[in-house]
């Protein structure tokens, strides 16, 4: 089979062998063809060049290293030699751990196409040598079962596919295997991984389906739909497309019907984004692929309805999606909390997939407006600038309880970043007939085909820091063609293509476009593109200028969390206030002016890059990010309840850059109405105390910050927890500056049931320290309530002490946590 190149790392449409091309055309593929990322070379020492190089030098090697140290390869080694002695549930925490190597191989394969590397290629081969022997003779490859077939992982079920619609992830594993295998084949020409994936896919096609003797199940976690479309395009074998369509057609018609996995109703009847946000976006992307390849417009109508629901009611200003950690899910319409926003990194990537495919279907710039907003904000915030730290959720407000991690037990986000960033060049251009779409603005050199003839373009720009872009025609064999330049929504006065957000400052930005220094007769068409149709010559230069200045944004008043607040953006970048730049006052207590005035500044990347990544430091040497400063007020109550104000200078940084310099306060939405402000209050007795814990916990300051949940289901404020410790006795102590008389204490317990790992304690008690330094239980305690999210008050006989201790017993199978602990 002839070796080919991917159109885009994550696009359904690919450049295929001749036989597959014929199948694709007759099946009605996407009307717009993306330019392969291998045909677009992003320049080094630029905004995205730094990110891609960082992925190559740090993120992908780190992911492979973690696969070694965290036992991912060991699962395959044990599966090659099954044994009843293996306790799979302990040896393999999650049934989808196999996907970490698959996704990292995929990302590494994209890197290989741009940066050939014999050592990396050999390493991937060595990993495949570990994976291959774990495959069963009939093609089944699922180490959560194969390690110990008689006693598999507790999520696997007693037989194949029996828990697929619940938690087994057998088809999810297949999906990532196929995506990685196709990428590896196209990067190297080797069928080593592809043949493994084809054997597993053939096993699935034989055993899963609507026919007698088959398991009539659909993926519990979607992605196989996208992957099987990609395998169909790579091989020309229609059975894979038919299986993908079966997964969609039967969703909502099998035994499990729940919003969590979008199986609550048939997909063609769905019109609202619900449930697990990553599952949802992967399904919507799969629907677009199947629609494009089969010509079934009913899928397109369904996706259009769902997309409209997302952008008009469920999209964060950062482009993130997923409002709640309860099921990692979309919230209700207009439910967009900030501190508890989930906005999973994988969901941001999924949001890019969906908008990308809808552009390929419809050709309208509004989809790239959403894609760009997600890309520059809610997606790249998920990985540190040095490539070595990751966010799982990406909240829009923090009090120090959030920090990037080098890895996670559930490592879907780091490995997803591995495969996404190297594919970014494939999102820049697209072609339809004799039109070239310029969708993203980044410095690059490209080679594309227009009507089968070669065209070479390059871009030179400092975007997103300024709005000047030079597009040069380096070669043109196609003669006349249309260059369609996207005019971003932020230039046209529309943050998103709905009324969910709007600019509140009354400004009107403009733009100019010239060819070889002269204005041209062109205009913005209904699709949102400025189209210049001419016979292009080598050396022609199109200069684009977008006005770029700070803008204030308000949310639809139905978004309760953002009422009375503004967010601030400049170009495609959303800004935030963070503690390191605003020393000496609490950014949580600020009040914006009615007409803010912003000054632009620059901030060095020094301090944002971990010094241990020396190979990355040089990429950012001499580089700066754009900052904004403005005058604001801080509000504070004194002990008598009198409100005072103080003028301050507030510095704002790009949202993606937060949490690189230690833990502390961060805020995207800033109060502009007094009723939305949160004045600081005098320190409570607990806030004055030295706080110590029995073992390390996150967000230590949260239990003395004065914030309490609104009700038993409110998880929008910070909390501490002892997860993953279980069945232990834990304690917290307050030591006061001097002896105090206390007689009552209030605790707000954190409990994230039924989904999470925390419950209220089995029991708890209070102790005080006597003059001899001994701990004694407080006398006369009336009760020790254990209710979640409400005030659990215990009254006792007054005691005078310098220290008090809360001691609790964790349940056998769960951890404990609490929002607040006060004493009076």
PLM regions and their residue ranges:
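Bacterial Sec-dependent N-terminal signal peptides
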Residues: 1-22
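Aromatic (Trp/Tyr) and acidic
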Residues: 22-118, 122, 152-187, 222-239, ...
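Asp-box/WD-like beta-propeller blade repeats and closely related beta-sheet repeat scaffolds
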Residues: 147-168, 194, 199-215
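Short, surface-exposed beta-strand/strand-loop-strand elements in extracellular ectodomains
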Residues: 172, 496-505, 510-515, 755-772
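C-terminal beta-rich recognition modules with glycine/proline-rich loops and embedded aromatic residues
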Residues: 244, 303, 369-377, 382-472, ...
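Aromatic, loop-rich ligand-recognition surfaces of beta-strand-rich domains
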Residues: 678-681, 713-779, 784, 788-824
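Predominantly extracellular/luminal regions of secreted and cell-surface proteins
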Residues: 679-713
């Amino acid at each position: 089979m002839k070796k080919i190149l991917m159109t885009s790392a994550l696009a359904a449409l690919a450049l295929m062998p001749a036989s597959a091309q014929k199948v694709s055309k007759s099946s009605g593929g996407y009307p717009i063809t993306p330019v392969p990322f291998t045909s677009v070379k992003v320049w080094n020492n630029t905004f995205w060049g730094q990110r891609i190089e960082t992925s190559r030098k740090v993120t992908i090697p780190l992911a492979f290293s973690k696969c070694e140290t965290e036992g991912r390869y060991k699962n395959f080694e044990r599966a090659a030699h099954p044994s009843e002695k293996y306790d799979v549930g302990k040896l393999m925490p999650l049934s989808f751990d196999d996907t970490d190597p698959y996704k990292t191989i995929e990302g590494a394969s994209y890197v290989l196409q741009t940066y050939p590397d014999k050592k990396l290629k050999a390493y991937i081969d060595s990993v495949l040598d570990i994976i291959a022997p774990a495959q069963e003779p009939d093609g089944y490859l699922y180490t959560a079962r194969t390690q110990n077939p008689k006693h598999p992982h507790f999520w696997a079920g007693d037989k194949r596919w029996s828990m697929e619609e619940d938690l087994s992830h057998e088809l999810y594993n297949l999906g990532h295997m196929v995506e990685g295998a196709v990428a590896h084949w196209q990067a190297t020409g080797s069928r080593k991984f592809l043949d493994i994936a084809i054997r597993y896919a053939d096993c699935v096609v034989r055993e899963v389906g609507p026919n007698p003797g088959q398991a009539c199940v659909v993926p519990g976690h979607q992605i196989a739909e996208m992957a099987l479309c990609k395998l169909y395009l790579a091989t020309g074998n229609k059975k894979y497309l038919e299986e993908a369509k079966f997964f969609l057609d039967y969703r909502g018609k099998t035994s499990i019907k729940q919003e969590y996995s979008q199986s609550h109703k048939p997909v063609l009847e769905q019109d609202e984004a619900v449930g697990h946000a990553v599952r949802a976006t992967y399904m919507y992307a799969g629907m677009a692929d199947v629609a494009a390849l089969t010509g079934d417009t009913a899928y397109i109508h369904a996706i259009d309805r769902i997309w409209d629901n997302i952008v008009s009611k469920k999209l964060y200003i950062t482009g993130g999606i997923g409002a709640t950690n309860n099921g990692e899910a979309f919230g209700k319409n207009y439910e967009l909390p900030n501190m508890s926003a989930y906005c999973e990194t994988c969901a941001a990537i999924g949001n890019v997939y969906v908008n990308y495919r809808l552009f390929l279907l419809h050709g309208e710039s509004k989809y790239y407006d959403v894609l760009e907003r997600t890309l520059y904000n809610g997606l790249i915030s998920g990985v540190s600038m040095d490539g070595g730290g990751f966010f799982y959720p990406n909240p829009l407000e923090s009090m120090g309880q959030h920090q990037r991690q080098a890895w996670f037990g559930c490592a879907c986000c780091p490995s997803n970043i591995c495969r996404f960033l190297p594919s970014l060049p494939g999102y820049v251009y697209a072609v339809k007939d004799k039109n070239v779409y310029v969708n993203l603005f980044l410095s690059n050199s490209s080679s594309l085909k227009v009507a089968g003839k070669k065209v070479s373009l390059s871009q030179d720009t400092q975007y997103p820091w300024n709005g000047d872009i030079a597009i040069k025609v380096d070669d043109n064999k196609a003669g006349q063609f249309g260059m369609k330049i996207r005019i971003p929504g932020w230039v046209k006065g529309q943050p998103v293509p709905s009324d969910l957000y709007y600019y509140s400052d009354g400004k009107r930005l403009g733009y100019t476009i010239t060819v070889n220094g002269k204005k041209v007769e062109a205009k913005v068409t209904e699709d949102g593109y400025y189209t210049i149709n001419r016979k292009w010559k080598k050396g022609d230069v199109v200069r684009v200028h977008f006005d770029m200045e700070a803008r204030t944004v308000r949310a639809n008043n139905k978004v309760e969390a953002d009422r009375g607040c503004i967010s601030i953006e400049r170009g495609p970048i959303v800004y935030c206030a963070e503690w390191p730049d605003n020393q000496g006052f609490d950014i949580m207590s600020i009040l914006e002016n009615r007409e803010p005035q912003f000054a632009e500044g620059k901030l060095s990347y020094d301090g944002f890059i971990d010094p241990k990544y020396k190979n990355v430091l040089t990429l950012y040497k001499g580089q700066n990010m754009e900052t904004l400063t403005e005058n604001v007020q801080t509000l504070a109550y004194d002990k008598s309840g009198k409100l005072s104000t103080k003028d301050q200078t507030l510095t704002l940084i790009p949202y993606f850059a937060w949490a690189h310099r230690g833990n502390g306060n961060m805020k995207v939405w800033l109060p502009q109405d007094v009723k939305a402000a949160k004045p600081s209050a005098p320190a409570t007795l607990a806030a004055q105390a030295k706080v110590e814990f029995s073992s390390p916990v996150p967000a230590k300051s949260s239990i003395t910050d004065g914030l309490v949940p609104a009700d038993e289901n409110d998880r929008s404020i910070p909390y501490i927890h002892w997860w993953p410790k279980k069945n232990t006795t834990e304690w917290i102590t307050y030591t006061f500056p001097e002896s105090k008389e206390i007689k009552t204490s209030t605790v707000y317990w954190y409990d994230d049931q039924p989904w999470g790992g925390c419950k209220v304690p089995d029991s708890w008690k209070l102790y005080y320290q006597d003059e001899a330094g001994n701990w004694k239980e407080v006398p006369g305690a009336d009760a020790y309530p254990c209710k979640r999210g409400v005030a659990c008050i215990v009254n006792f006989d007054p005691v005078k002490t310098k220290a008090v201790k809360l001691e609790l017993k964790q349940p056998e199978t769960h951890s404990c946590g609490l929002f607040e602990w006060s004493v009076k």
